[in-house]
Amino acid sequence: AGCKNFFWKTFTSC
């Protein structure tokens, strides 16, 4: 759970 998730990157800057 984190940047590894494409959906998470959608609204999270890594």
Swiss-Prot record:
KW Secreted (keyword) present: yes
One term under GO cellular component: extracellular region
Disulfide cysteine pairs (residue numbers): 3-14
Domain of life: Eukaryota
Key words of the record: Disulfide bond, Hormone, Secreted
Keyword S-adenosyl-L-methionine in annotation: no
InterPro entries: Somatostatin/Cortistatin_C
Subcellular location: Secreted
Molecular function in Gene Ontology: hormone activity
UniProt record similarity statement: Belongs to the somatostatin family.
Role, per record: Somatostatin inhibits the release of somatotropin.
Protein name, entry field: Somatostatin-1
Naturally occurring in which organism (per UniProt): Oncorhynchus kisutch (Coho salmon)
